């Protein structure tokens, strides 16, 4: 009886030593693994969006969510992104698409005009967040503008 008690006590001690020698994974380490998986999924989603946006016009590449500030600064320097360059690009684009051309004040004239503008656009929209929610939609826009009339311009008397 004494021998059996001694052996069972020895087994219990060995089991406790064995369990304490292999600690369970802490919450922090499993949380870090989850964050890495989320980061990878976010990168993949960003790359999918970038591949799908080939037809869009961008002034510069936006920084990714998980890039360090140093990487963002390097990209900003490489692409020469300054306020002046952004304003120049906006002005160039507005001049390119602007429909109004001003004439000098000394010019006189009169006449008729007609204006006809059509616009069609088709695209898709994708959205995803960190909780795994996603939304996808397609859109189509058709627009037609027209006008006609008479004009007179020049110095008024």
Swiss-Prot record:
Q: Which N-terminal residues, if any, form the signal peptide?
A: 1-21
For this UniProt entry, which segments traverse the membrane?
none
Please indicate if the UniProt record lists Signal as a keyword: yes
Record keywords: Host cytoplasm, Host nucleus, Secreted, Signal
Q: Where in the cell is it found?
A: Secreted; Host cytoplasm; Host nucleus
Q: Which domain of life is it from?
A: Eukaryota
Which GO cellular component term is one of those annotated?
A: host cell cytoplasm
Extract the ranges annotated as region (Disordered).
Answer: 124-157
A biological process term (GO) from this entry: effector-mediated induction of cell cycle reactivation in host
Q: Where is the composition biased (Basic and acidic residues)?
A: 128-138
As for what it does, the entry says: Effector protein involved in the induction of tumors in infected plant tissues by the fungus. Required for the reactivation of plant DNA synthesis, which is crucial for tumor progression in leaf cells. Interferes with the MAPK-triggered phosphorylation of maize SGT1 at a monocot-specific phosphorylation site, resulting in both modulation of immune responses and reactivation of DNA synthesis during leaf tumor formation.
Q: Subunit comment for this entry?
A: Interacts with a maize homolog of SGT1, a factor acting in cell cycle progression in yeast Saccharomyces cerevisiae and an important component of plant and human innate immunity.
Give the protein's recorded name: Secreted effector protein See1
What gene does this protein come from?
See1
């Amino acid at each position: 009886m004494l021998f059996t008690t001694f052996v069972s006590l020895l087994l219990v001690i060995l089991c406790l030593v064995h369990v304490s020698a292999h600690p369970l994974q802490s919450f922090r380490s499993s949380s870090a693994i989850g964050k890495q998986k989320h980061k990878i999924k976010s990168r993949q989603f960003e790359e999918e969006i970038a591949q799908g946006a080939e037809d869009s016009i961008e002034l510069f590449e936006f920084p990714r969510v998980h890039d360090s500030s140093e990487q963002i600064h390097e990209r900003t320097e490489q692409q020469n992104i300054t306020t002046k360059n952004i304003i120049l690009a906006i002005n160039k684009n507005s001049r390119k698409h602007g429909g109004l051309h001003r004439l000098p004040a000394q010019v006189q004239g009169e006449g008729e005009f007609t204006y006809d503008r059509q616009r069609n656009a088709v695209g898709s929209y994708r959205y995803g967040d960190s909780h795994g929610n996603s939304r996808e939609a397609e859109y189509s826009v058709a627009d037609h503008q027209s006008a006609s009339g008479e004009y007179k311009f020049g110095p008024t008397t």
